[in-house]
A protein has these predicted regions:
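A short, hydrophobic beta-strand-centered structural micro-motif
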Residues: 33-41
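Charged, amphipathic alpha-helical segments and their flanking helix caps
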Residues: 1-24, 44-142
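Short acidic low-complexity segments
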Residues: 24-33
Length: 142
């Protein structure tokens, strides 16, 4: 599911901003071509609600590297608004997941945008596997 979220974020950014930007999900140690976005998953969390229901939390950070040093802050502020609008609702597996706790800031002239996606998933459990742990007890004995 992590890769599906990252893929969907990348696709949405590509649809919104087009081919004039680079989109990186893997680390780039050198030769980062700007303007570009890097997309990372921070610390996903899964909590079990039952044997088949799981609450998932997927915090994503998007870094935007601007190539225009003359209007860096002004361009980055506008970019933050556009990215948030683009990623507020993320299509994944024929459903829309709404981003929450959206915030952004500038760090060392790089725009950082944080969005958390929360959703519930179900796990398919084979009925035969579930039935193997049942034991019959005589409830009429006192």
């Amino acid at each position: 599911m992590v890769n599906k979220i990252l893929d969907s974020v990348t696709i949405q950014l590509g649809k919104t901003f087009g081919t004039g930007y680079r989109y990186y999900v893997e680390n780039v140690k050198q030769d980062l071509q700007t303007p570009c976005f890097t997309i990372d998953m921070l610390q996903p969390l899964e909590r079990s609600r039952s044997k088949v229901l799981y609450d998932r939390t997927m915090p994503v950070v998007i870094h935007y590297f601007n190539d225009n040093q003359n209007t860096l802050k002004k361009d980055s502020y506008e970019m933050a608004e556009r990215v948030i609008e683009c990623l507020e609702y993320l299509p994944v597996d024929n459903a829309l997941i709404r981003g929450e706790n959206i915030k952004w800031l500038m760090v060392n002239d790089v725009l950082e945008i944080f969005i958390t996606y929360r959703f519930t998933t179900t796990k398919v459990v084979d009925v035969e596997d579930s039935m193997t742990d049942l034991n019959q007890a005589n409830i009429n004995t006192r």
